[in-house]
């Protein structure tokens, strides 16, 4: 029985892949054989999305007056009291703490932050050396654990990419957060996004995806997906582009990544784009750094409830969302301290989480959704358009001596572990309910000999 992942999911929901013939006996007697793709390393992915970050500039200080010019009744914060800078000393403190505690995710670098200056050239108010040091800090401390995204060009005014200047009219029609993007074609969005991505590239930063500022393309999502695929591949050559646009906080609503516009899956140049969904609102310190949140919104002190508990217990990726000004909170670090409490509580409650970058989650979900799986006797064949580490399968039967064969090479036996928590690359676990196998899925043909 040969299934691609989309039909495979439907079958799995009714009991998995049913195989009626087999040369060996399993512990479940005559039940139909099932193969189901699990989470990576049999763990629940968790991640943190950081919006409104960039080099040096406090986006709240410079952004609020630009938003207020368009909507004066909505943006009444006293932006002059906010610091103009979020210092690199805090970037280092935050990045090093996250690294020590395995926290990973996405870190925006707004290319032309609130129209103050270009991260790849200069930003008035800071020296050239200060900007270079800030970029070096991001490369050395942030990049190892975080995906870098542009959050379009300025996050405030729309830029005329022919001139590099903001359009003259301060109206919703020419703000990145609001109306400009809602009626643009995929080619128009791709050109604008490529402009932002090219600044990230010129600054010497890696990138596989992008983040939308505010309501950017909220009513134009198909073109957003197509334009992300086009722009990220054109500028950076990323194999699996991804983007963050939406979050959902309603209990029971799926927040699983969405694999979109898959094509040429059996060819030499397969394509897709992945929409990453957040599962929380900003309950850290808000986008302006003026409204303290609470760790209880994520996970309560008794560890029994909260949005992260809901999502983790559903086994979907639990991806928190915050804004850099709220993490710094004008030097009081309110959001940062809330993050520390949340991570501490998650560690107290769970022992089956894995922190991942958004690109790592996107890659796994692309492989999970698009790999063709065929079980024939004691041979399980997986034809994968994309490789991914930690690919994990659950079988409702127990093989005797499972091994992996890649492209006709010798069979490499799996090492057996006696605890699910010990599952890692090229190991397997079994009990009365069946078995779990974990391995690095290679692009192309993979054979599991069971």
Please give the residue ranges for each predicted region.
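N-terminal secretory signal peptides
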Residues: 1-3, 7
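Active-site beta->alpha N-cap acidic-glycine motif
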Residues: 32-147, 154-156, 194-217, 296, ...
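Catalytic cores of secreted or luminal carbohydrate-active enzymes
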Residues: 333-367
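N-terminal export signals
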Residues: 7-27
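Well-ordered, non-membrane alpha-helical segments in soluble/globular domains
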Residues: 80-94, 125-135, 186-194, 223-232, ...
């Amino acid at each position: 029985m040969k299934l691609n992942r989309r039909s495979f999911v439907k079958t799995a929901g009714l009991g998995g892949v049913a195989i009626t013939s087999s040369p060996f006996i399993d512990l479940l007697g005559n039940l139909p054989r099932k193969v189901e793709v699990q989470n990576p390393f049999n763990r629940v992915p968790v991640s943190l999305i950081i919006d409104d970050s960039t080099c040096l500039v406090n986006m709240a200080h410079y952004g609020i007056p630009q938003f207020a010019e368009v909507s004066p009744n909505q943006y009444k914060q006293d932006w002059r009291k906010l610091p103009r800078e979020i210092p690199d000393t805090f970037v280092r403190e935050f990045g090093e703490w996250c690294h020590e505690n395995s926290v990973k995710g996405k870190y925006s670098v707004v290319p032309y932050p609130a129209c103050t200056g270009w991260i790849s050239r200069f930003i008035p108010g800071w020296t050239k050396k200060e900007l270079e040091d800030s970029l070096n800090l991001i490369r050395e401390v942030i990049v190892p654990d975080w995906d870098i995204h542009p959050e379009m060009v300025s996050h405030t005014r729309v830029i005329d990419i022919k001139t590099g200047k903001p359009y003259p009219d301060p109206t919703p029609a020419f703000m990145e957060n609001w109306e400009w993007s809602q009626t643009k074609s995929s080619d128009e969005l791709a050109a604008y996004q490529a402009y932002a991505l090219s600044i990230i590239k010129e600054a010497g930063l890696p990138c596989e995806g992008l983040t939308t500022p505010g309501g950017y393309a909220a009513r134009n999502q198909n073109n957003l997906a197509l334009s992300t695929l086009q722009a990220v591949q054109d500028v950076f050559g990323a194999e699996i582009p991804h983007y963050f646009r939406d979050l959902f906080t309603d209990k029971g609503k799926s927040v699983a990544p969405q694999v979109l516009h898959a094509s040429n899956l059996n060819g030499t140049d397969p394509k897709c784009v992945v929409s990453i969904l957040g599962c929380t609102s900003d309950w850290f310190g808000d986008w302006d750094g003026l409204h303290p949140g609470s760790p209880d919104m994520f996970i309560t002190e008794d560890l029994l409830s909260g949005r992260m508990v809901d999502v983790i217990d559903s086994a979907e990726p639990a991806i928190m969302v915050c804004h850099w000004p709220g993490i710094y909170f004008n030097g009081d670090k309110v959001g940062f301290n809330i993050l520390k409490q949340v991570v501490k509580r998650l560690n107290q409650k769970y022992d089956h989480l894995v922190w991942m970058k958004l690109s790592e989650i996107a890659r796994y979900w692309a492989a999970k959704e698009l790999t063709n799986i065929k079980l024939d006797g004691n041979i399980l064949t997986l034809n994968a358009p994309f490789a991914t580490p930690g690919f994990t399968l659950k079988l409702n039967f127990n093989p005797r001596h499972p091994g992996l064969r890649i492209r006709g090479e010798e069979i490499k036996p799996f090492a057996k572990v006696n605890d699910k928590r010990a599952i890692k690359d090229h190991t397997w676990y079994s009990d009365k309910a069946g078995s779990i196998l974990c391995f690095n899925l290679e692009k192309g043909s993979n054979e599991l000999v069971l």
